[in-house]
Amino acid sequence: VPHRVDYRPVEYESDMPAVLAAADLVLCRAGATTVAELTVIGRPAVLVPLPGAPRDHQTLNAKGLVDAGAAVLVKDADLDGDRLTAEVQNLFEDPVALEEMGESSRTMGRGDAADLVADLVGRVASGEAATREHDRG
């Protein structure tokens, strides 16, 4: 029995962590924050980089997940209903591979990123980070 795809378009959702946590597969752009969120919660994705993004940074973001086996990349120009259906169907036909993609995604995540940034800001504010950089030089 083929897996039934339950697709629910919404105009706006304020609780994206809950939406992502409920998803089996995420179709999205490949902005840095989105990619980071996917890896923290360990979700597989079909990533469609935004065309015209400065220095094509979204494609670079996507390639990190693709290379790790956590996502599939589809160029915006190649995305239509048939292509999307094929990508989603291929992924849902192999639930083990889909689960492995999620695990690959999770291994890339840094759940402690906010703490690391706060620590760095504190060290910079106290002059400690500048001293460490000077000592390395």
Give the predicted meaning of each segment:
Residues 1-137:
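Nucleotide-activated sugar donor-binding and catalytic core shared by glycosyltransferases
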